[in-house]
Each structure stands twice: as structure tokens, then as C-alpha cells.
Amino acid sequence: MDRLSRFYTMKKVIFTLCGIVLMCGTSFAWGTRGHEATTKIAEKHLTPKAKKLLDKYLGGRSIVDFASWADEYKKELLFELDFEPSNAPRRLRFPHTFEANADCSVFDGDRRGDEWVKNCVYMAVGYAKDLKANHKNMNNDERFHKIAMLIHWLGDMHCPAHIRYPGDQTSSGYEVMIGDRAVWYHRLWDGILFNWLHPSSQGDAAEAIDTCTPKEIAKIVEGDLYDWGKDAATASRATRKYRDGAQINRKEFVEEFSELLDQQIRNGGYRLAQLFNEIFQ
């Protein structure tokens, strides 16, 4: 059974587990719905050639179907790096984040040995380069894996909770208070805020968020993955004003960061489309 077939077998189990997870109040990165909104926006902005090749490589499925595949793949990724999930160095357990320098530029992940693994931007650069050069000759498993990881990483790298800053390597991994309720701040960005702002389907959310003109989109997709990472880190830095134990007023928080959330979801979608359009030109 190839990786694409295994995914659909696993997905039946995942959907069942998601129902339990949602009842327990937990969430996935950006929120499953947030990732789906990003990919739905991206799908709308693919060139006909890129869409045709993605349809072929994904077995006729939409990229939206694989928006959160990488979250389900984390343990397998560790095995590929020759670690067990239980004994991997802590930094290797977070391959869906990236580290920013003091000026918010993306940490050049190949400078310090295996520390590059925590840098999803660095990994995405390598995957995109490999796909562009070799997608016609790759086996189905390898090609699917690289496409699915790029789909997810472009969403993750735009999420404020997935960016690490000098002196703050927490990825928002601490509790804050909303009223008398303790909430993991990372989770506030990984689904909760999106669900507050967009309680309807991800399709409705994508339509509401995808509001930029062609000229604005052209400006957003300028540069490369490192430029996009710096832009995301710069825009997201203000979210770290809330520290461990901070009291958050829900209404004020929504007013302060609703525009940022929509911007990051939207930018991730436009840039994902641009990346695939360049790879499959």
C-alpha cells in the first residue's frame, strides 16, 4: 500500500479521533479548519498547469484534503531521521516551526549541524527545489510526501505560534487566562481564535479572507520562502506581548489580532499557490 492509500485508511480513523478531540477541547496546528482555509485559498490561485499536475500527483484529490496530513505524519518523520519519538532530542520534535533572528529574518538552518531540523522554512526550501528539479522522475511516495509537507509547512510558517524568537524559544507554549479559564497560548493561535472569528465552514472562511486584488497578491508573493518567513515573523512578533499567566480579555484580543490572523491565513494561501506555480511551471 503506497503512502497515498495509507493516508485515506488512516484518515477514517483520524476523523473519528478528531470528534473525540474536539469534544475534549484540543486542536491541531493553525486548527485543521485554518489549514484547510489556507489551502482552499491556494487552490483558487493555482495556474491551470500546476493544478493539473497536482490533481495527477494526488490521485485526483484536492490539496485541501491534505491540509493537515503533516500533523499526522510527525512520528514517521522522526523515524526517517533515525530517531524514536520517545528519544528524539526535544528540538527535533518540533519540525513545524522556524527560528527567527533578531531582525526577524529566518535563521539559516544549515549553520549549526542538525539544528536545521526544527526549521520548517529551511526544509521547505529543500523540498521545493527537489520537486522542481525531479518531480517527473520521483516515485509516487516520495513525490506525495514532499507535496503534502509543503502544503502544511506554508500554513505553519505563517502561524504566530510556530515562530521562535531570540530569547523566546517557547512557540507560545505556556498558559494564559481567559476569564477564569487557563488556556495554552499556543492553542489560542492553533485553532481557537480562528474558530471564534470563523465559526462557519472553512470554505466560507476562505471566501471571506481571500479579498486581495491581483496587484496586492503580486506584492505579497514577491521574494522567496526566506522572505516570506521574515515577513511572517515581523508581523507576528506583537503576539508575544502576552506571557505566561497573562490575563486576556477575549473581546480585546479578537479586536487586536483578528486582522493579523486573516492576513496570515491569506498570505499563506497566496504563497502556497505561488510556490506550486513555480515548481510546476
Model-derived regions, located:
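Short, Lys/Arg-enriched N-terminal segments with co-localized hydrophobic residues
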Residues: 1-9
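Sec-dependent signal peptide recognition
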Residues: 11-16
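Repetitive helical segments and hydrophobic/amphipathic motifs
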Residues: 20-21
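N-terminal signal peptide c-region/cleavage motif recognized by signal peptidases
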Residues: 24-26
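N-terminal, motif-rich segments that launch catalysis or mediate targeting to/interaction with membranes
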Residues: 28-153, 160-281
